[in-house]
Amino acid sequence: MNGFSHFNEQGRAQMVDISEKSSTVRTAAAVSSVHMKNEVYEKIQSHDIGKGDVLAVAQVAGIMAAKQTSNIIPMCHPLSLSGVDISFDWKIKEAEVILHIKAQVKTKGSTGVEMEALTSASVCALTVYDMCKALDKGMVIGPTFLLEKTGGKNGDFKRELSEYNLEDQK
């Protein structure tokens, strides 16, 4: 099937056999964002959201999501993660506030952690939305993308943010 490793000879889905791949340190970082009204930002900052500390809950949700990625992405291998770190950065604009979320994941294993990082960043953003939707159902999530990855036979990857007009997503 022309370069896609998740298909067998019959064109059906398969989980790739990684038993012959060497175990190396692998990392990945993914980002997402939540665009919201100033009012939502102020309530998050003052811990005035009825459901609790939004960023603390989102952080735990992101860590849990990284650990559970193989349960929701069918062809992902279950991995023993060495670490997951979530960071948040606010960008305050005139008409809106943007919460930038960065998920960094690390393992020593036979396959990469890109999907774990992407899942983690996505679930963080979804959790923020869930906890704040009573104030602003018009929040926008995204973009969500892989920022960088290291390790593995395909080598390292680092996204050039200027290519996609994403300089403020760092």
UniProtKB/Swiss-Prot annotation:
Q: Which residues bind substrate?
A: M75, C76, H77, M115, E116
Q: What class of enzyme is it?
A: lyase
Q: Name one GO molecular function term.
A: cyclic pyranopterin monophosphate synthase activity
Where on the tree of life does the source sit, at the highest rank?
Answer: Bacteria
Keywords for this protein: Lyase, Molybdenum cofactor biosynthesis
Query: What sections of the sequence does the record tag as coiled-coil?
Result: none
Q: EC annotation?
A: 4.6.1.17
State a single Pfam family of this protein. MoaC
One of the GO biological process terms: Mo-molybdopterin cofactor biosynthetic process
Pathway connected to this protein? Cofactor biosynthesis; molybdopterin biosynthesis
Q: Which residues form the active site?
A: D130
Q: Where is the signal peptide?
A: none
Which reactions fall under this protein's catalytic activity? (8S)-3',8-cyclo-7,8-dihydroguanosine 5'-triphosphate = cyclic pyranopterin phosphate + diphosphate
Family matches, as PANTHER family = CYCLIC PYRANOPTERIN MONOPHOSPHATE SYNTHASE, MOLYBDOPTERIN COFACTOR SYNTHESIS PROTEIN A
Write out the similarity annotation. Answer: Belongs to the MoaC family.
What is the protein's quaternary organization? Homohexamer; trimer of dimers.
Reported function: Catalyzes the conversion of (8S)-3',8-cyclo-7,8-dihydroguanosine 5'-triphosphate to cyclic pyranopterin monophosphate (cPMP).
Record-given protein name: Cyclic pyranopterin monophosphate synthase
